[in-house]
């Protein structure tokens, strides 16, 4: 009589542990899909923390079965929830509609004072700058319809006063 009662208690406890182990796994998977879509790192970490505690508590009575199932899956659940949360807040982020202040920037209709900057319709005062319809005062500058006063400058329809200059329709002083 004692053996049958003991075996019934083991079956009931084992069945309840399997049910308890399956509920957190379903909740973890649901929590992962919610955190991936809504990007809420707090909810994923708190649920996985509470469920891993109950998994460890039930794992002490049954031995190795619930420990292996909940241990492996809760580990993957916690790692995926943390990576899902970290994608929202990190370096190398892409922002739209914000002011970017850095080198090698491309501006339109503004005054660019830096190296390797591309400006259109504005005065550029830097080396290796490309300007259209404006006065360029720098080396290796390309100007159209303006007076260029530098070495290796290409001018069209204007007076060139420099070495190695290419002029069209005017007298060259080389």
UniProtKB/Swiss-Prot annotation:
It is a lipid-anchor. A lipid is attached at residue 30 (N-palmitoyl cysteine). Residues 1-29 form the signal peptide. Its main location: membrane. Sequence repeats lie at residues 88-99, 100-111, 112-123, 124-135, 136-147, 148-159, 160-171. NCBIfam families: Mplas_variab_LP. The numbers of repeats can vary and is one of the basis of the antigenic diversity. This is Variant surface antigen B. The gene is vlpB.
């Amino acid at each position: 009589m004692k053996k049958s009662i003991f075996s019934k208690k083991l079956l009931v406890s084992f069945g309840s542990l399997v049910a308890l182990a399956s509920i957190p796994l379903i909740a973890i998977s649901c929590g992962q899909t919610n955190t991936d879509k809504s990007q809420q790192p707090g909810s994923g970490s708190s649920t996985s923390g509470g469920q891993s505690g109950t998994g460890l508590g039930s794992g002490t009575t049954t031995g190795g079965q619930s420990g292996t199932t909940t241990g492996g899956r809760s580990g993957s659940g916690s790692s995926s929830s943390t990576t899902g949360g970290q994608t929202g807040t990190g370096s190398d982020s892409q922002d739209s509609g914000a002011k970017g202040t850095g080198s090698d920037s491309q501006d339109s209709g503004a005054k660019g004072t830096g190296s390797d900057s591309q400006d259109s319709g504005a005065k550029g005062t830097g080396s290796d700058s490309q300007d259209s319809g404006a006065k360029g005062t720098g080396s290796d500058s390309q100007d159209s319809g303006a007076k260029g006063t530098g070495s290796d400058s290409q001018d069209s329809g204007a007076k060139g006063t420099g070495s190695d200059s290419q002029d069209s329709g005017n007298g060259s002083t080389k």
